[in-house]
A protein has these predicted regions:
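Intrinsic disorder/low-complexity signal
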Residues: 4, 59, 138-139
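Acidic-basic catalytic patches of nuclease active cores, encompassing PD-(D/E)XK
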Residues: 1-50
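Compact nucleic-acid interaction/catalytic patches
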Residues: 80-86
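Non-catalytic C-terminal interaction segments of nucleic acid-processing enzymes
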Residues: 23, 49, 64-69, 86-99, ...
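Structural beta-sheet core signal
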Residues: 73, 101-104
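Acidic carboxylate-rich catalytic motifs and surrounding loops in phosphoryl-/glycosyl-chemistry enzymes
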Residues: 32-35, 103-108
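Conserved catalytic cores of phosphodiester-cleaving nucleases, focusing on short active-site segments
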Residues: 59-80
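A short catalytic or substrate-binding loop motif that flags glycine-/basic-rich loops and adjacent residues
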Residues: 53-56
Length: 202
């Protein structure tokens, strides 16, 4: 699949995901700056200061539910991998007390989990599926395509080649459980003093 085909498939996956969430009763809005301010974020593609990185890797959407709504971030990934920079920025978002759900899709499979429950496979392990001469370099468990001569010879002109890890599929939940898992999490996270004021449709 070419870069353009992957991009098109990823956009279709995200659109369907957000439509599915709306159908479940969630109110959903776009959040990622590549959707809301594409010209602005394109100027930041090489910026690595913290604010620019947070902007570049903002989750794709935000969603809420309830009479007095509670909210969460949602990221749509049409892949089984996570970029290192994205993972770090997601972690900072969660460390600040935010809820982030990442939904993965590929080959008609849709699965998800909360950021903190997702496990990543060290590159030293996932790389064992390939012959030694076909493996990319690994540093601190992250795979670095750009640091290999293989990348120079085979890369797509639009592919990023940034460090990544594969996601452990055993740490993900079937999408059919999404509504239940999210609503239960939002109930747990609410302040006890506000329990009588928050009502969910579940």
């Amino acid at each position: 699949m070419s870069f353009e085909e992957r991009s098109k498939a990823a956009k279709e996956f995200q659109d369907k995901l957000f439509a599915d969430l709306q159908a479940m009763g969630f109110n959903v809005a776009l959040n990622g700056t590549e959707h809301t301010h594409p010209a602005f974020v394109s100027e930041l593609h090489r910026s690595e200061d913290q604010t620019s990185m947070a902007i570049r890797y903002a989750p794709d959407g935000v969603a809420c539910i309830g009479k007095i709504p509670r909210s969460f971030y949602v990221e749509a990934k049409f892949a089984r991998t996570i970029e290192r920079n994205a993972w770090i920025q997601y972690g900072k978002l969660v460390e600040a007390g935010n809820i982030l759900v990442i939904v993965f899709g590929w080959e008609n499979n849709t699965v998800f989990n909360f950021y903190e429950n997702i496990k990543l496979i060290p590159g030293e392990i996932s790389g064992l599926r390939y012959p030694a001469e076909s493996r990319y370099p690994v540093e601190d468990g992250w795979i670095y395509p750009r640091k290999s001569k293989l990348w120079d010879n085979s890369k797509s002109p639009k592919a990023s080649g940034t460090p990544y890890k594969e996601v452990d599929l055993n740490s993900l939940i079937p999408f059919s459980e999404f509504y239940k898992e999210i609503v239960n999490r939002l109930r747990v996270e609410q302040c006890p003093s506000m329990t009588s004021n928050i009502s969910f449709s579940a």
